[in-house]
């Protein structure tokens, strides 16, 4: 299971054709990486979040569900922002917004 597929992102962006698939895929990958970095998640933590697991050694079922929903919102927001502002994106503003969105799940220290 991927937390968000290209089809999910295209639906959120209201892109109907396959003409933008490559662009949406690149932006989605960038959005995922940016959100992982801002949330300060390790690759191992992301692997659990992006899987079908109901819980893990690190997260309860409720925590994992809440983290997944928060990450979905942040990733889709980021993908849409990058898609709509291809030419003139304000990455500082985007980063500050993502910090606010991801604050509740943000890890306390860098790994």
Identify the function of each model-found stretch.
Residues 1-111:
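Divalent metal-cofactor coordination and adjacent catalytic microenvironments
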